[in-house]
A protein has these predicted regions:
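Conserved C-terminal structural/oligomerization subdomain of aldehyde/semialdehyde dehydrogenase
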Residues: 117, 154, 208, 236, ...
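Conserved sugar-transfer catalytic core signal across GT-A, GT-B, and GT-C glycosyltransferases
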Residues: 56-58, 234, 316
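Well-formed, non-transmembrane alpha-helical positions, independent of function
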Residues: 60, 110-111, 167, 237, ...
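Structural detector of well-ordered beta-strand residues that form the stable sheet scaffold
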Residues: 69, 98, 144, 246, ...
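Residue-level signal for inorganic ion chemistry
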Residues: 7, 65, 97, 120, ...
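ALDH superfamily catalytic-core signature
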Residues: 119, 127-268, 297
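Thr-Gly-centered strand-to-loop micro-motif
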Residues: 64, 70-71, 122-123, 182-183, ...
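Rossmann-like NAD(P) dinucleotide-binding subdomain of oxidoreductase/dehydrogenase enzymes
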Residues: 6-9, 19-163, 288
Length: 322
């Protein structure tokens, strides 16, 4: 549904692509800005939301009058191909919405170096984003990028704990923790640390893992064996450095990619899980004492994208937000 919502939104917004009239340096002159299509655009999309991420990129491009070439993730090509088929059935002219699948290095290299492509939109890792930016430099392409995330989730001692637990469930375990805006590091003030951890654990233990087509199942597998192996490695590293597994902590099936929804307590910043993007249903909970400590911990990352915090003190809300 979110993919359809994107298309509808951008189709309507295309009616409001306004220009600007800017006062000139002389009283009898006006500067007029008219927005026009940039030209052929390309999108490199991730696997975690294979339909909606394409709609989010192709929707505004097509609405603005720009042909779009999509390279979907190798793990999830079928959504893009199905959209190409539907576009053809709907009467979209050939060449306006195109899909290319295959070797990501070769396709990405062509997109970044071909002078016909005027703009690239990419969602993925920071490492790959840097490579694409370097490759685009020779043709000075416009770029829009959404890169890796390491979102902090802060719970202050005056927060509504039940609301914070509900928020953590939504922002951490959605899509098995495989979103770039997932809560990656949970910082909880000492006064409510135990209460929050136990209430969250009650909710997490109730998550049913399995086939997403079965009734009651809320979490499916991770995208690949490599992803499950990485989740396992992060938990083991944290345990080796003193973390406590409050729940989960291992694969549901040793031969599959289902990973149990996990909570780690007694976490510290020396653990890999404190600095790496997790992309798994693992919630590491850090304890803090003061507002200043929470801000320092939250900002101690090279990533961005999102942040969450819970408090009922309006002064604290503004101070932390700013």
């Amino acid at each position: 549904q979110s993919g359809l919502d994107y298309l509808e939104w951008f189709a309507e917004e295309a009616k409001r692509i306004y220009g600007d009239v800017i006062p000139g340096h002389m009283s009898d002159k006006r500067l007029i800005v008219i927005k026009q299509p940039v030209g052929v655009t390309a999108a490199i999309t991730p696997w975690n939301f294979p339909h909606s991420m394409i709609s989010r990129k192709a929707g505004p491009a097509l609405a603005a009058g720009c042909p779009m070439i999509v390279k979907p993730a190798m793990e999830t090509p079928f959504s893009a191909l199905a959209m190409a088929y539907l576009a053809q059935q709907a009467g979209v002219p050939d060449g306006i919405y195109s899909v290319v699948t295959g070797d990501p290095v070769a396709i990405g290299g062509e997109m970044t170096t071909n002078a016909m492509v005027k703009k690239i939109s990419f969602t993925g890792s920071t490492r790959v984003g840097k490579i694409l930016m370097k490759q685009c430099a020779d043709t000075v392409k416009k770029m829009s990028m959404e890169l890796g995330g390491n979102a902090p989730f802060i719970v202050f001692d005056d927060a509504d704990i039940d609301a914070a637990v509900t928020g953590a469930m939504m922002s951490k375990y959605r899509n098995s923790g495989q979103t770039c805006v997932c809560a990656n590091r949970l910082f909880v003030q000492a006064g409510v640390y135990e209460a929050f951890s136990q209430k969250l654990a009650e909710q997490v233990r109730a998550i049913k893992v399995g086939n997403g087509l079965e009734a009651g199942v809320a979490q499916g597998p991770l995208i690949s064996q490599a992803a499950a192996n990485n989740a396992e490695a992060l938990v083991n590293d944290a345990k080796d450095k003193g973390a406590t597994v409050l729940c989960g902590g291992q694969r549901v099936d040793a031969d599959a990619n289902f990973f149990a929804p996990t909570i780690l307590t007694d976490v510290n910043k020396d653990m890999r899980i404190a600095s790496e993007e997790i992309f798994a249903p693992i919630a590491p909970i850090f304890k803090f004492e003061t507002d200043e400590e929470a801000i320092a911990l939250a900002n101690d990352t090279e990533y961005g994208l999102a942040g969450y915090f819970y408090s009922r003190d309006i002064g604290r809300v503004w101070r932390i937000a700013e």
